[in-house]
């Protein structure tokens, strides 16, 4: 006989057992990488088309500073930082797509908007995957190849947007066999409801670890 209370208890156990605390896990820099997803001016800088609707969550999370601290700590430990960029739109890119592509209004090729935020520029030794067309950094890119080439089997996700590209890339990572860590405060979204749904409901189900930036840095230092 179905018992709602028991079902909720089991579901809660599954959710919260999926994510470990920082004290339970450490990260080998030679086997781990930070995946920095879409750190574009379009999202992160005043003047970006998506900045006005991202600003609330970016400010609430202190997200840009946390992303910067994360990649700096990763580099200092010898861990790879891999940029995972969204496709740069050119006129005609989506012509003939059976179910449509994007609006073509954002991420325009050759513009300041698709440059990386000034505090999150690539550094020598960083890697960059091929651009993803939709949400997942793995679909139709070389990200899986880059990770395997460098012997990496643990990925840590940060960047934009919490409930789309971050979440989709994390789901693919888990399906492909990577130990996957999601961060609660090195991300942004278009509003707090999106952020809360991602962090409180989806991430604990998807990820092996769900940590704050401080917890993650402590686990790699």
Where in the sequence are the language-model features?
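Short beta-strand segments at enzyme active-site cores
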Residues: 79-86, 183
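N-terminal signal peptide c-region/cleavage motif recognized by signal peptidases
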Residues: 17-18
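Bacterial N-terminal signal peptides that target proteins for export
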Residues: 1-9
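N-terminal post-signal-peptidase region of extra-cytosolic proteins
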Residues: 56-66, 70
């Amino acid at each position: 006989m179905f018992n709602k209370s028991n079902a909720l208890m089991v579901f809660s156990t599954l959710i919260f057992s999926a994510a470990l605390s920082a004290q339970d896990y450490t990260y080998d820099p030679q086997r781990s990488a930070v995946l920095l997803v879409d750190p574009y001016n379009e999202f992160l800088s005043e003047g970006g088309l998506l900045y006005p609707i991202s600003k609330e969550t970016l400010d609430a999370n202190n997200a840009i500073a946390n992303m910067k601290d994360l990649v700096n700590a990763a580099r200092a430990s010898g861990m790879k930082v891999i940029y995972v960029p969204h496709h740069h739109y050119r006129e005609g890119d989506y012509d003939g797509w059976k179910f449509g592509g994007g609006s073509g209004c954002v991420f325009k090729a050759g513009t300041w908007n698709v440059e990386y935020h000034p505090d999150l520029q690539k550094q020598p030794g960083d890697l960059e995957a091929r651009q993803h067309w939709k949400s997942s950094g793995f679909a139709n890119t070389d990200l899986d190849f880059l990770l395997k080439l460098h012997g990496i089997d643990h990925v840590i996700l940060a960047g934009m947007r919490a409930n789309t590209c971050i979440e989709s890339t994390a789901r693919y990572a888990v399906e492909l066999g990577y130990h996957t860590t999601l961060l609660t405060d090195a991300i942004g979204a278009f509003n707090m409801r999106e952020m809360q749904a991602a962090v409180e409901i989806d991430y604990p189900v998807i990820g092996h670890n769900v940590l704050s930036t401080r917890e993650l840095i402590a686990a790699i230092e």
